[in-house]
């Protein structure tokens, strides 16, 4: 057996020392991969559905607060203000999630039905409704926005916040909203957009494309591809002008969109005609 010299042993130790950062990085990557891929497998056609939101429900509110710096509360308040919610209103909140908008409507005296495809999101929402003391005026039900099990022409106000881009058939959902709306009813849609103009547009696009999927997955305990889907859905959503045209095609008269966060969030308000 060849005897290694002291110099050879030193050289080998130096090589190992230079390799340790790569080994550490590989270990971290393995832990992260195990976190995501040992989780329940989500099929590609489950992305954006109730199945996906069932998984991220426990940490959904916290993730929203961090990723929006708490600004999403103000955007939802603007939605409610734009519809002039009153105590006489019969309101429908679609993609209600954990019921933030439904609760805001109930606090203004409206009778509210919140509909969502995720049971786990609704379970959290019901707890928040009870905590707000609104069980008598806010009800939450499982449902599909493209096939509502509701009578026609019964709602004065219809809302959907940060949810319409996850509906596979957006136009079908808009037509259902018009079907259940009374003539003259107001529709409010709050949704993300990718700013196309302004010096902050590249920053906003990078935030949605990179920060949202990574930070969202870490905060919610979800898989990276689940929040990457949300980023893609924002990138693929129609521009404000084009979406306004689709609202009009469903039977509404749409106002000029209202922009927030340098155009990254858009409020659409329309009247059923």
Regions found by a protein language model. Give the residues of each.
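Class I SAM-dependent methyltransferase SAM/SAH-binding core
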Residues: 90-147
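A short SAM/SAH-binding and catalytic strip from SAM-dependent methyltransferases
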Residues: 156-170, 193
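A short glycine-rich, Lys/Arg-flanked "PGG" loop and its adjoining helix->strand segment in the class I
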Residues: 171-186
């Amino acid at each position: 057996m060849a005897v290694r010299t002291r110099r050879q042993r030193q050289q080998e130790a130096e090589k190992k020392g230079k390799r340790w950062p790569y080994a550490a990085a590989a270990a971290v990557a393995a832990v992260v991969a195990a976190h995501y891929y040992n989780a329940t497998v989500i099929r590609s056609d489950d992305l954006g559905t109730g199945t996906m939101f069932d998984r991220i429900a426990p940490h959904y509110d916290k993730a929203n607060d961090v990723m929006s710096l708490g600004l999403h509360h103000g955007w939802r308040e603007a939605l409610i203000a734009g519809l002039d919610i009153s105590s006489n209103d019969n309101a429908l909140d679609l993609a209600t999630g954990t019921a933030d908008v439904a609760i805001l409507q109930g606090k203004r005296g409206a009778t509210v039905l919140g509909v969502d495809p995720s049971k786990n999101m609704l379970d959290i929402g019901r707890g928040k409704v009870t905590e707000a003391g609104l069980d008598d005026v806010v009800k939450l039900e499982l449902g599909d926005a493209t096939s509502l099990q509701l009578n026609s022409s019964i709602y004065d106000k219809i809302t959907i916040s940060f949810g319409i881009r996850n509906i596979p058939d957006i136009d079908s959902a808009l037509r259902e909203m018009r079907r259940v709306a009374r003539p003259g009813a107001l529709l409010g849609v709050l949704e993300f957009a990718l700013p196309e103009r302004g010096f902050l547009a590249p920053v906003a696009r990078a935030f949605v494309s990179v920060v949202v999927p990574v930070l969202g997955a870490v905060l919610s305990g979800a898989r990276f591809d689940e929040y990457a889907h949300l980023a893609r859905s924002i990138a693929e959503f129609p521009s404000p002008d084009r979406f306004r045209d689709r609202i009009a095609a469903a039977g509404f008269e749409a106002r000029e969109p209202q922009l927030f966060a340098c155009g990254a969030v858009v409020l659409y308000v329309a009247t059923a005609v």
